[in-house]
Regions:
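Active-site-adjacent structural elements that line small-molecule/cofactor binding pockets in enzymes
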Residues: 1-212
Length: 212
């Protein structure tokens, strides 16, 4: 991270997998020329710890998750981690979140895989309250708890930006992702796309925002 800052890079991003099962049936969506999963999938450090170290070693470098599997962590715990990292880095954190592709991994960690974005939507509501309100109380489908206090609050107000990723499938961007961003996200993380494709996606997302 320090070397990246010295070279003039503006940001530093890390991925996330808490675990991967030793065997699983879900097909990895990012296979390359060798038609197999890359070794780094099994070698990822905890992103929040890695970024805390990166923040301490730098002064201007923006840091972010690309992406953190938000449904695999309890939102109260994650809200505190995000706020702490953003506070210690003086507002340099960007919160990229995803739902994950591996059903077996997600289910081991308590995710309702078929409805994982609904679960994440609840989690984001909880975290946004933790970041802005003196107390947070929630009664939903996936999370249910009485009023609690969660500190510290993040450096960025009202909260670090929440980004959602998407990839092109069949030559088209997912409109469902854009709708989520417009409804409760703060930004977009396009994956494996060229400038022209990104420009098309940005126009589509702006059109949805203008219609809402």
């Amino acid at each position: 991270a320090r070397h990246a800052e010295e070279l003039g890079f503006s940001s530093y991003w890390v991925p996330d997998h808490i675990i991967l099962p030793s065997t699983y049936d879900t097909e990895y969506p990012g296979k390359g020329l060798e038609d197999k999963e890359p070794d780094y999938l099994w070698q990822m450090p905890d992103p929040m710890i890695a970024l805390m170290r990166a923040a301490g070693a730098t002064s201007t470098l923006e840091i972010g998750t690309a992406v953190l599997l938000a449904g695999e962590r309890h939102p109260l715990h994650l809200a505190k981690e995000v706020a702490s990292l953003d506070s210690f880095s003086k507002g340099r954190f960007h919160f990229g979140i995803g739902a994950g592709w591996c059903r077996e991994e997600a289910e081991i960690l308590g995710v309702d895989f078929d409805h994982r974005w609904g679960q994440i939507k609840e989690a984001i509501k909880i975290m946004q309250s933790c970041w802005t309100d003196p107390e947070t109380e929630f009664h939903g489908k996936y999370y249910d708890f009485p009023a609690v206090r969660c500190y510290p609050k993040p450096h960025q107000k009202p909260n670090p930006p929440v980004y959602l990723p998407s990839i092109i499938v069949g030559g088209e961007w997912s409109q469902r992702v854009f709708k989520r961003i417009v409804e409760w996200g703060d930004g977009w993380l396009p994956v494996v796309a060229d400038i022209d494709q990104i420009a098309i996606g940005m126009r589509q997302m702006r059109d949805l925002a203008n219609e809402s």
